[in-house]
């Protein structure tokens, strides 16, 4: 069963896909969205769902370090609710605290990637970390 991991921001959604057995996550792409205009990138998400035969979504929850929920948590949950309604597939949530920080550190320390290039892949890598954390927790 393939699972799609999503790192939801106000302008982009990082996408990761699990392998068919659900053991590993791979970063796939970054989808441009516009929350204010109600553009959530679902046309592209649908193409990916159909291509990979996705059966479940995992949406990252950007909780505060003290475990409280802020406005981005609410936005991520609203995005998850829209996914569930639009696709009719189950949506789980994964604590994503520090995933973007970890992703950026990996890109700097291990790949020595410039700031401009990091901006282009950071959300995809964060989605991969969110999904991998979810998969590790489940198995």
Swiss-Prot record:
<dbReference type="InterPro" id="IPR006641">
    <property type="entry name" value="YqgF/RNaseH-like_dom"/>
</dbReference>
<keyword id="KW-0690">Ribosome biogenesis</keyword>
<dbReference type="GO" id="GO:0000967">
    <property type="term" value="P:rRNA 5'-end processing"/>
</dbReference>
<dbReference type="InterPro" id="IPR012337">
    <property type="entry name" value="RNaseH-like_sf"/>
</dbReference>
<keyword id="KW-0378">Hydrolase</keyword>
<protein>
    <recommendedName>
        <fullName>Putative pre-16S rRNA nuclease</fullName>
        <ecNumber>3.1.-.-</ecNumber>
    </recommendedName>
</protein>
<comment type="similarity">
    <text>Belongs to the YqgF nuclease family.</text>
</comment>
<dbReference type="GO" id="GO:0004518">
    <property type="term" value="F:nuclease activity"/>
</dbReference>
<keyword id="KW-0540">Nuclease</keyword>
<keyword id="KW-0963">Cytoplasm</keyword>
<dbReference type="InterPro" id="IPR037027">
    <property type="entry name" value="YqgF/RNaseH-like_dom_sf"/>
</dbReference>
<dbReference type="InterPro" id="IPR005227">
    <property type="entry name" value="YqgF"/>
</dbReference>
<dbReference type="Pfam" id="PF03652">
    <property type="entry name" value="RuvX"/>
</dbReference>
<comment type="function">
    <text>Could be a nuclease involved in processing of the 5'-end of pre-16S rRNA.</text>
</comment>
<dbReference type="GO" id="GO:0005829">
    <property type="term" value="C:cytosol"/>
</dbReference>
